[in-house]
């Protein structure tokens, strides 16, 4: 039997833990996915692979297949672009240097934003640190959670649309590479790059940019995601069919108390197999 057929679906390839902006440790993320019927899962924390070992061990104990992953931050003009990076080599020098730079920028940004917010609201740095776990890089979601905990906003959504909104008095932009560079780094690290939620509220990226990303090694698009919208979604369906690209579906789960639930969108077995076959950076962890 081919190696790529050793896994079992359903497969959810976009899950976050407390190592980035999720609320649960990696082991609990795997347990939550298992309770929702997921049998192959990828941990894709933002700009870090630090949760892989714990997630892999937990997945094995649950007879699940673990797909090592990451969600690499990128930026096109004013817009954030997220590149799902499956089965990369975590020790690749180029990718590692970039993720370290992004994480450092995220911490600096969080401190500056916290200082700005503290001028007008009853919020201190320790309130934000209380929302993080060991090993996590403090980011905007943790500031949002601190605002919720202090009763300054109702939920993360209100924080992101108000106090933390881009262009607002307290906002500071995060350093991130352009999407073509990000895709090239993932591909260069032996990984399989897939654009996350590509037809969301911000609309599609320019066709010329998508073409450049494809030339840099982009493998596909996450079309199964609650944020995607028509008509952009149909445009991408057509593109994926014409270019024979990988199509994924995922929950983008961030933990308990968040709306996205594991397994609400899944990836077809044939597409998971293509990801595994294409990757050279690392390998799935089978039960």
Model segments located where?
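Extended substrate/RNA-proximal surfaces in nucleic-acid metabolism proteins
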Residues: 2, 58-208, 270-282, 286
């Amino acid at each position: 039997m081919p190696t790529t057929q050793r896994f079992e679906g359903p497969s959810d390839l976009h899950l976050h833990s407390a190592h980035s902006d999720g609320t649960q440790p990696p082991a609990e993320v795997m347990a939550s996915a298992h309770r929702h019927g997921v049998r192959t899962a990828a941990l894709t924390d933002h700009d870090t692979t630090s949760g892989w070992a714990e997630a892999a061990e937990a997945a094995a104990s649950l007879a699940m297949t673990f797909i090592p992953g990451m969600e690499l931050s990128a930026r096109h003009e004013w817009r954030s672009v997220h590149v799902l990076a499956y089965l990369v080599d975590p020790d690749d020098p180029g990718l590692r240097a970039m993720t370290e730079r992004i994480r450092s920028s995220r911490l600096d940004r969080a401190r500056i934003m916290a200082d700005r917010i503290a001028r007008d609201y009853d919020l201190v740095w320790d309130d934000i640190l209380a929302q993080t776990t060991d090993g996590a890089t403090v980011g905007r979601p943790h500031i949002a959670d601190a605002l919720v905990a202090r009763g300054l906003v109702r939920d993360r959504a209100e924080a992101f649309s108000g106090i933390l909104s881009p262009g607002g008095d307290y906002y500071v932009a995060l350093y991130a590479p352009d999407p073509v560079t990000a895709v090239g780094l993932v591909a260069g690290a032996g990984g399989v790059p897939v654009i996350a939620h590509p037809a969301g509220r911000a609309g599609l990226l320019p066709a010329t940019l998508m073409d450049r990303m494809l030339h840099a090694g982009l493998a596909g698009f996450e079309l199964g995601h609650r944020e995607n919208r028509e008509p952009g979604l149909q445009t991408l369906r057509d593109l994926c069919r014409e270019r024979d690209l990988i199509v994924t579906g995922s929950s983008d789960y961030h933990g308990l108390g968040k709306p996205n639930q594991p397994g609400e969108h899944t990836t077809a077995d044939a597409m998971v197999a293509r990801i595994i076959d294409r990757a050279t950076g690392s390998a799935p962890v089978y039960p």
